[in-house]
From Swiss-Prot:
Gene3D superfamilies: Alpha-1-antitrypsin, domain 1, Antithrombin, subunit I, domain 2, Helix hairpin bin
Name of the protein described by the UniProt record: Serine proteinase inhibitor 2
This protein's record includes keyword Nuclease: no
Main location: host cell
Transmembrane residue ranges: none
Protein family (similarity comment): Belongs to the serpin family. Poxviruses subfamily.
Keywords tagged on the record: Host cytoplasm, Host-virus interaction, Inhibition of host caspases by virus, Modulation of host cell apoptosis by virus, Protease inhibitor, Serine protease inhibitor
InterPro entries: Serpin_CS (IPR023795), Serpin_dom (IPR023796), Serpin_fam (IPR000215), Serpin_sf (IPR036186), Serpin_sf_1 (IPR042178), Serpin_sf_2 (IPR042185)
GO BP term, example: symbiont-mediated suppression of host apoptosis
Protein's organism: Variola virus (isolate Human/India/Ind3/1967) (VARV)
A Pfam family hit: Serpin
UniProt-recorded Gene Ontology molecular function terms: serine-type endopeptidase inhibitor activity
Gene Ontology CC annotation, any one: extracellular space
PROSITE patterns listed in its UniProt record: SERPIN (PS00284)
Amino acid sequence: MDIFREIASSTKGENVFISPATISSVLTILYYGANGSTAEQLSKYVEKEETMDKVSAQNISFKSMNKVYGRYSAVFKNSFLGKIGDNFQTVDFTDCRTIDAINKCVDVFTEGKINPLLTEQLSPNTCLLAISAVYFKAKWLIPFKKEFTSDYPFYVSPTEMVDVSMMSMYGESFNYASVKESFGNFSIIELPYVGNTSMMVILPDKIDGLESIKQNLTDTNFKKWCNSLEATFIDVHIPKFKVTGSYNLVDTLVKLGLTDVFYSTGDYSNMCNSDVSVDAMIHKTYIDVNEEYTEAAAATSVLVADCASTVTNEFCADHPFIYVIRHVDGKILFVGRYCSPTTN
């Protein structure tokens, strides 16, 4: 959560969407070639790939790609290449066609949703370029019916309002909790997808209450809040939205303590014999949240439609909120902030 908090703090008023899981994956690749304090700092973000493999195998709407491009004139150690396999490729960074090739690869992989990835010519001094790309488009286990979607006011601030396409469902049972903390009160709800992932939406009681929640959004707190959820019949209203994210993570990670990882301070002597530096870490994301549902999910919603009369709660995301997409084992795959409908 620390990467999200840092990015959200530096981009106030903007939508944010990142994938901590894929960022950890590409940092793990760098860890394989690191030594000394560089390896020590990177070890904080090294995680097993097992969860990502499970998601990829069971949810065909999830795609992630991590790549490390190295300068063709550098000789990389076999021990390093053996650990990263197909995630590594040597290129000529001085050739303008290199950017086109990288962009084409990402474009095809993400079905045209992330293009272009690189928008500027790389420096001829570039030795290494690390990239993580992710595409996520999932179907709800319980669908939002399109006939219930309508224009609805979204409060960007207590004094500013814009209309959004608000998806609605009535009388369904979701895991839900109303949380009271010293830094603010909020609601949290779990909206499951088909497969093995779900979206957790954290909605402050106050229109302008998201900042304090963001500041206190730690892995420990998030797990505590999720453990407080209980099955509740509830009306749900959430905006229909698309969000893209584009970040160079170097400055963010340096602020978080990875001071010996980038530029000339990085020790990658386990990667190659010559001096190399990580000059950029590009992270682009895309998410599409809409009413889409599978036939099986639609049948499920019909089975409980007669419960609408028992609803005593309402979850209406008509002001800025945080959303977290996680695997059933608790691993966080994505985290985002939705606060600016006009930038969709």
